C-alpha cells in the first residue's frame, strides 16, 4: 500500500474537491451503511451474506460474487481433510489465512507438491487440476476471474474431475483406460462423495502388482476411503527437485511500517507465479486508533477481506465531483471479521481502526502489476508537488494557510487517528437515524398521499359508478318507454286491423243483405209478372168463353171479375201484410244481429285482454325459461371446458408417457446393441489372441500313452 508515485497535475486537480466531499453517495443506490442488519451497501458483503457452495463435517466452501466477473471463495478444511481433485476454469490466486496443508497439482504433465502455511500467497493457472490435503485446520481465501459465461449453464470457477470423467460413456472410458467392464461398473454404481472428505486412510494390505492399476482407478473415483488410499499409495515427490515458491506476507519485510501499522503488497515482481495474472495481493495491519490516509488506487479495484478486529471504511463517490451540494457524496460503513468490502478504481478511501482493537485486512487488487496508490495527505501528499498558488486558489485559501495545512502532518501513509473510527461511527449512526427519520417521514408522506389518492380514486369510482348507474337507469327507462310505445303502437295497429276487419265484415254483411233484398225484389217482380201473365191468360180464356157465351155469361163475367178483383185485393192485402211481417222480422233480426255483434265485440275484447295477459305471462315464462336454459348452457359449457382440459391433459400425459416409454425402449435397445457389439468385439479380440498364441506357440506332441 505504500508504493506510490506522483501522477500528472491534471489528474490531481480532478480529486482536490473530491477529498472534501464527505457525505455518503449511497443515495444513488438507495441504501445506507450496512452494519445495521436492516441496511445493505453495494460495496460491502457481510459474512452471513455469503453463498454456501459446499458444507460437510470435514469442511465448507462459501462464496461472494463481485461485479465484473470476480468470484471469491472461502475454503475451510478441518484437520486431516481432503479437497477432492478439481479442474480450474480460470486463474486462481489465493491467500492462506490460517493452518497448514499440502497443495498438489499437475504442471506440464508432472505432479507438483507445495506445503501451505499461514500467510502464503500463490497462483494456479486456468486448466490446472489440483487437490488440497490439510494438516491443521486450513482456511484459504481465493479469487477467480470467471468473466462472462459463454455457455448455459455457466461452468463456474472449477469442475470436479470425477464429474468430468463420468461424463463420458462406458465404451469411451473402457477404450481409453483399457480396463474391464466391471471396474467401470463399480465407478458408475458408487455413491458420489462430497467435495470435501476425511483424508484418513483405512488399513489395507498390499495386493498383487497386477491389481494396483485397477484399484487405483477405482479408488480415485468411487468412495471417500478409496480416495484417501490413493494419497497413501502415491510415490513421494523427490524433495531434491526444485519446488514452486510461495510468497509469505508474514516472513517478508513490509513495504511500509510505523507505530501506527504496516502494509505489504505482493505483485508479479515479488512472486513469479503472478506473472500474466490479473490479480495482486495486499495486507494491512492497523494498530489501535490508526488510519490509512485518504488515497485512491489509479490502476486497480481493491477487494478486501477483514481478517481480524473491526474498523470503519469511507469511500468517496467520484460521480459527486461536479458538485459538493449533493448531500450523498461518500459512503461510510463498519466492517468486522469475515466481511468483504470493495473499493472501485479511482475512488478515494480511508480505513480506520477503533481505539479498543487493531484492524487487520487483506485483499486482492485487480492488477498484478505494481500499483502506486496516491495519497492526499501526509509527507507523500500529491498536493505538495502542485504549485502552492494553484492549490490556494483551488481551496480559496491564502498561501500561508495552505502552507500550514501541508506541513502540519509529519507522518505518511498510516497516521495516528484517535477516536476517528468512533467519530465516524457516531456520525454514521446519526446519518442512519436521520436517514431512517427521513425515510419514515417519506413513508408517512407517501402513505398519506396514497391514502388521499385512494380516497380520490374511491370518490371518483363512486361518481363513475353513480353516473354509470344513472346512465343504466336512463337507458332502462328509455328502453321501457320504447317497449311500451312499441306495444301501444302494436296494440293500436291490431285495433285498427280489427276495426278494419269488422268494418269489412259489416260491409260484406250489408252487401249480402242488399243482394238478398235485390234477389227478393227480383223474385217478387218475377212472381208478379208470372201472376200477370197467368191473369192475362185467364183473362184471354175468359174473354174467349165470354166471346163464345157473350150475353148469357156477361153478368156472370162481371160478377166473376168483381170477385176476382176482390180476391186480387185480398191477395194484395195479404201480400202487403206478408211484406210488413217480413219487414218487421228483418228489423227484429237486425236488432238481434246488432245485439249479437255488440256481445261478440265485448267477448272479443275480453278474449283479447285475456290473450294479452296470457301473452305477457308466456313472455315472462319464456324469459325465465331462456334464463334457466342460458345458465344451464353456461354450466354445461364450463363442465365441457373442464372435461376438455382434463381430456387434453390426459392426452398430453399419455403422449409424454408413451414418449418416455419409447425413449426408454430406444435407450434399452441401444444399450443392448452396444453390449452385443462389445461382446462381439471382445470375442473377436479373444479369438485373435488365441490364434496369435497358437501361431506363437505351436502345439507340442503328446507323450505316448503308457500301456
From Swiss-Prot:
Glycosites: 60, 203, 285, 356, 396, 399
Residue span(s) of domain Cupin type-1: 42-185, 247-403
Keywords for the protein's UniProt record, in alphabetical order: Coiled coil, Glycoprotein, Signal
Signal peptide: 1-24
Ranges annotated as biased composition (Pro residues): 698-707
Keyword Iron: no
Region described as Disordered: spans on this chain: 439-707
Pfam families (alphabetical): Cupin_1
Gene3D superfamilies given in the database record: Jelly Rolls
InterPro entries found in the cross-reference section: Cupin_1, RmlC-like_jellyroll, RmlC_Cupin_sf, Seed_Storage-Functional
Domain of life: Eukaryota
Comp. bias intervals (Basic and acidic residues): 439-696
CDD domains, per database record: cupin_7S_vicilin-like_C, cupin_7S_vicilin-like_N
Physiological role: Seed storage protein.
Protein family: Belongs to the 7S seed storage protein family.
Entry protein name: Vicilin-like seed storage protein At2g18540
Species this chain originates from: Arabidopsis thaliana
Amino acid at each position: 500500500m505504500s508504493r506510490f508515485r506522483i501522477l500528472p497535475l491534471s489528474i490531481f486537480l480532478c480529486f482536490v474537491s473530491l477529498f472534501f466531499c464527505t457525505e455518503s453517495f449511497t443515495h444513488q443506490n438507495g441504501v445506507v451503511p450496512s452494519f445495521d442488519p436492516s441496511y445493505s451497501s453495494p460495496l460491502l458483503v457481510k459474512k452471513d451474506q455469503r453463498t454456501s457452495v459446499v458444507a460437510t463435517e470435514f469442511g465448507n466452501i462459501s462464496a461472494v460474487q463481485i461485479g465484473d466477473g470476480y468470484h471469491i471463495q472461502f475454503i475451510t478444511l478441518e484437520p486431516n481433510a481432503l479437497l477432492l481433485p478439481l479442474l480450474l476454469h480460470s486463474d486462481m490466486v489465493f491467500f492462506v489465512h490460517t493452518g497448514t496443508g499440502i497443495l498438489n497439482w499437475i504442471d506440464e504433465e508432472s505432479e507438483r507438491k507445495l506445503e501451505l502455511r499461514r500467510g502464503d500467497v500463490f497462483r494456479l493457472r486456468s486448466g490446472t487440476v489440483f487437490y488440497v490435503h490439510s494438516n491443521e485446520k486450513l482456511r484459504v481465501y481465493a479469487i477467480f476471474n470467471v468473466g462472462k459465461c459463454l455457455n448455459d449453464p455457466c461452468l463456474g470457477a472449477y469442475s470436479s474431475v470425477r464429474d468430468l470423467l463420468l461424463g463420458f460413456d462406458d465404451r469411451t472410458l473402457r477404450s481409453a483406460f483399457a480396463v474391464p467392464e466391471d471396474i467401470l461398473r463399480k465407478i458408475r454404481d458408487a455413491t458420489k462423495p462430497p467435495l470435501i472428505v476425511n483424508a484418513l486412510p483405512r488399513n489395507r494390505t498390499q495386493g498383487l502388482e497386477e491389481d494396483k492399476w485397477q484399484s487405483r482407478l477405482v479408488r480415485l473415483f468411487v468412495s471417500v476411503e478409496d480416495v484417501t488410499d490413493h494419497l497413501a499409495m502415491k510415490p513421494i515427490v523427490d524433495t531434491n527437485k526444485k519446488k514452486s515458491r510461495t510468497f509469505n506476507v508474514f516472513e517478508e519485510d513490509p513495504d511500509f511500517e510505523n507505530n501506527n501499522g504496516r502494509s505489504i503488497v505482493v505483485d508479479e515482481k515479488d512472486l513469479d507465479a503472478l506473472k500474466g495474472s490479473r490479480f495482486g495481493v495486499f495486507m494491512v495491519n492497523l494498530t489501535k486508533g490508526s488510519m490509512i490516509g485518504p488515497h485512491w488506487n489509479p490502476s486497480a479495484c481493491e477487494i478486501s477481506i477483514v481478517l481480524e478486529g473491526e474498523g470503519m471504511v469511507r469511500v468517496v463517490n467520484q460521480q459527486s465531483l461536479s458538485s459538493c451540494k449533493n448531500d450523498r457524496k461518500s459512503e461510510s460503513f463498519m466492517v468486522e471479521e469475515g466481511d468483504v468490502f470493495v473499493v472501485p478504481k479511482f475512488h478515494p478511501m480511508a480505513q480506520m481502526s477503533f481505539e479498543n482493537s487493531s484492524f487487520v485486512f487483506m485483499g486482492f487488487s485487480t492488477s498484478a502489476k505494481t500499483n502506486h496508490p496516491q495519497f492526499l495527505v501526509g509527507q507523500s501528499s500529491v498536493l505538495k508537488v502542485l504549485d502552492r498558488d494553484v492549490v490556494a486558489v483551488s481551496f480559496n485559501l491564502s498561501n500561508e494557510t495552505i502552507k500550514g495545512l501541508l506541513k502540519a502532518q509529519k507522518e505518511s501513509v498510516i497516521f495516528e487517528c484517535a477516536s476517528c473510527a468512533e467519530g465516524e461511527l457516531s456520525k454514521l449512526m446519526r446519518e442512519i437515524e436521520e436517514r431512517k427519520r427521513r425515510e419514515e417521514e417519506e413513508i408517512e408522506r407517501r402513505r398519506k398521499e396514497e391514502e388521499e389518492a385512494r380516497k380520490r380514486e374511491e370518490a371518483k369510482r363512486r361518481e363513475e359508478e353513480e353516473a354509470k348507474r344513472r346512465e343504466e337507469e336512463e337507458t332502462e327507462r328509455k328502453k321501457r318507454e320504447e317497449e311500451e310505445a312499441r306495444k301501444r303502437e302494436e296494440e293500436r295497429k291490431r285495433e285498427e286491423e280489427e276495426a278494419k276487419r269488422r268494418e269489412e265484415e259489416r260491409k260484406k254483411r250489408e252487401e249480402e243483405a242488399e243482394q238478398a233484398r235485390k234477389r227478393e225484389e227480383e223474385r217478387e217482380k218475377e212472381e208478379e209478372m208470372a201472376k200477370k201473365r197467368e191473369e192475362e191468360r185467364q183473362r184471354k180464356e175468359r174473354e174467349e168463353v165470354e166471346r163464345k157465351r157473350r150475353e148469357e155469361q156477361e153478368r156472370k163475367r162481371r160478377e166473376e171479375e168483381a170477385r176476382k178483383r176482390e180476391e186480387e185485393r185480398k191477395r194484395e192485402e195479404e201480400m202487403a201484410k206478408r211484406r210488413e211481417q217480413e219487414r218487421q222480422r228483418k228489423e227484429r233480426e237486425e236488432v238481434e244481429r246488432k245485439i249479437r255483434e255488440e256481445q261478440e265485440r265485448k267477448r272479443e275484447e275480453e278474449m283479447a285482454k285475456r290473450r294479452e295477459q296470457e301473452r305477457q305471462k308466456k313472455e315472462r315464462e319464456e324469459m325465465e325459461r331462456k334464463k334457466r336454459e342460458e345458465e344451464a348452457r353456461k354450466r354445461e359449457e364450463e363442465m365441457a371446458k373442464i372435461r376438455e382440459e382434463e381430456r387434453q391433459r390426459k392426452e398430453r400425459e399419455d403422449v409424454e408417457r408413451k414418449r418416455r416409454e419409447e425413449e426408454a425402449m430406444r435407450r434399452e435397445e441401444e444399450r443392448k446393441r452396444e453390449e452385443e457389439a462389445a461382446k462381439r468385439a471382445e470375442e473377436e479380440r479373444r479369438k485373435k489372441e488365441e490364434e496369435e498364441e497358437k501361431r506363437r506357440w505351436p502345439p507340442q506332441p503328446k507323450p505316448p500313452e503308457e500301456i
